[in-house]
Amino acid sequence: PISLCAINFRVDDNLGYLIRSAACFGAERLYVVGHVPERRRISAASGTLIDYVEIVQFSHPRDFLEHAKKEDLHVVAAELDERARPLSSHHFNFDRHLCLVVGNEESGVPPEIMAAAEILYIKMPGVGFCLNTSHTANIFLYEAARQYEDLESYNPILPVNSRGAQLVIKERKGE
């Protein structure tokens, strides 16, 4: 019951790492708002796991939000924001499909998605104030998967992509 959403990533490897993490933690799909690089540009970072995650592309944040509303996704954004609550004390609700959102490496999560999302941040006691966006996604995925695993319904079997070696990309524009 977990998906990821990457917003306008600038660095192809970050998207590749996100695909790898999504597959490792059992995320069903990766929504990408903006550009999806060619398979060859992200396959090194994603490894052989690129075939286990469905990638759904949206041109604009509003298109993703329309889809999220239609699918009744519980959107949770990772962002440093005054409205954000710490991930460490958050309990995810799995009554609805959970979609974890990470933003652009420089500009973060767009305001329109922030307005529609629950906002969380990662407490960091060290000298840095923010992590690489793919690292942030890893921590959010780990915590969501850990909490879900604590439920009796956890099933660690990964879905098999029936499309073989193809990168699965679906573009959706204003549904």
How would you describe each model-predicted region?
Residues 1-175:
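Post-transcriptional modification and biogenesis factors for structured RNAs
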